[in-house]
Every structure is written in structure tokens, then in C-alpha cells.
Amino acid sequence: MIKETDLENIPDLLIKFNEPLSNYTYTKVGGPADILAFPATIEALTELSAKAKATDTPVTVLGNASNLIVRDGGIRGVVILLEKLDSVKVAGYTIEAQAGAKLKEVTQVAQANSLTGFEFACGIPGSIGGAVFMNAGAYGGEIYQVLVSCKVMDAAGNVSVLSASEMQFGYRHSVIRDKNLIVLSAKFELQAGDPTQIQNEMDRLNFLRESKQPLEYPSCGSVFKRPVGHFAGQLIQEAKLQGQRIGGVEVSKKHAGFMVNVADGNATDYEKLIALVIEKVKENSGVTLEPEVRIIGEK
């Protein structure tokens, strides 16, 4: 296991020990990380990864911790948050953003540069790295539609660039997930557009989001993938599960596809409620819901 002394001389690296991950997740749940690291440069990330590998220390990389549940026992080893790697560069019709850049900010950069095609992501509460990891999408748009290439690092510290076809995108899936790669940055190809029209479309999508989703409570976003031929929220409604509560977590009364932390809930509450919803929806409709949210850590 990596020691504190192994990390002291890595420049541009902020370290916290036994840090509650509930301070960083959108659900406001999650036990402690043994070591929580915030690299501010690719070099710091590379050196940290190399030292973790040399000491057989497990590494977990989190995006913006939005579509994520960290269990109450926390995460052993090193947890890396990439929020300090957040640069965004524009060249012509191309935007290149580091993994820690927030989707909302990248869409604002696109609008300011009269670039259209990224509006669908304006309200997704995630980072570029997390969005690429799971091929995030909303309102008919998905990351795969605009991504050109992605710079990644493997567990050995090797950096490579994957083309869009090499990313093997699927519904809420990419090769990043399969091969345990770290997204460093992503390049997107957009089109020329009118900045006023782009802003109007973003305003429209944000209004839809705010009117239909329970943004006033901590949540992990959409809990379940969309089953073929159905909508998860509708199936949950039909099973009369809206308002169903376990501990401090309940199925949102505003949008059945969300589970909200209404009263200091924990990850165990989330997992129990997810299991209950899967069971009851299966009984009612015959459809087996599959979680979209990523659940990690120790119980």
C-alpha cells in the first residue's frame, strides 16, 4: 500500500486522508477514501498512478461523482478526483476539454464561440471524463455524436489516443469502462451556429430539466437505464412506487426515475430501494430494470 511519504514530493498534487466521499458525491452519501488525490497536472496524475502501481495500491478515478453511489464503507487505496484538470480549448470547430471540465462549462464555451451540437449536455451535472466514460446523453443527444477522439491513460501510465470508433460506444457504455482506462481529455467536433439560437435551445432544455426533475434534493440522476420499448420512470409509476422510501432515500414524487436523499440517507438506503424497485417493477410489468448509476466501494 502506498505511504504518505511516497506522495510528499509529487508536485501539483493535493492529498487528503480518510476523507468522507459524501462531501463530493451528488447523493451526499459515501464512506471515506483512504487517500483522496487531486492532481492539477497530467504529470502529477502520471506520477501518482506509477507510485500506486509500484506499491500494488488500488486506484479508483471519479468524474464529477454525479451518476454514482459510493457505499458506506468507502473506498480503499487511492481515489482520484480530476476536477483540477479542467482546461477547455477551442480551435475552429473543435473543442478539446480535459477530463475534469464540467459539461455545463464546456457547453457555455461552445455557445460563446458560436458552435452548435453540444446543447444537449448543458444540464447534465457531470464532467467530461465521466460523460465519456458512460456515453452520457439527454434529450436525444449523446457524447458519441460529437466526440472525435479521446486521450487516455492505462494502469501502467501509458498514454494513447483513441478514435471515436475505438471507443466502442453503446448506451451508457464505452471501452473506458471495459478496460479500466483513465480519460485525460476529449476532443469534440461541432458545427457553426448562431449563438442566440444556441442559448435559446440551452435555456429550453434547462427549463425542461428544472420543471421535470427533482433538482432541489441530492440525487444520482437517472437511476435506471431506459429499457427497450419502455421508460423506466413510467414503469416505476405504474408499480405505484413514487414516494416509496427506505431510510432517508425515496423515489421522487416529481420524477419516478430519480431517487432523492431527503433525510440524511446513506448508500445502504439507496441500494435497498434500488433492489426493491427492481423487484416490484418486475412483478408488475415483467420488465427487469438495469441500474444506470454506478455503485462502488465497500459496504
Curated annotation (Swiss-Prot):
GO terms for biological process: cell division; cell wall organization; peptidoglycan biosynthetic process; regulation of cell shape. PROSITE patterns: FAD_PCMH. Its cofactor is FAD. Its EC number is 1.3.1.98. Keywords: Cell cycle, Cell division, Cell shape, Cell wall biogenesis/degradation, Cytoplasm, FAD, Flavoprotein, NADP, Oxidoreductase, Peptidoglycan synthesis. Pfam families: FAD_binding_4, MurB_C. Its main location: cytoplasm. Pathway: Cell wall biogenesis; peptidoglycan biosynthesis. This is UDP-N-acetylenolpyruvoylglucosamine reductase. It comes from Lactococcus lactis subsp. cremoris (strain SK11).
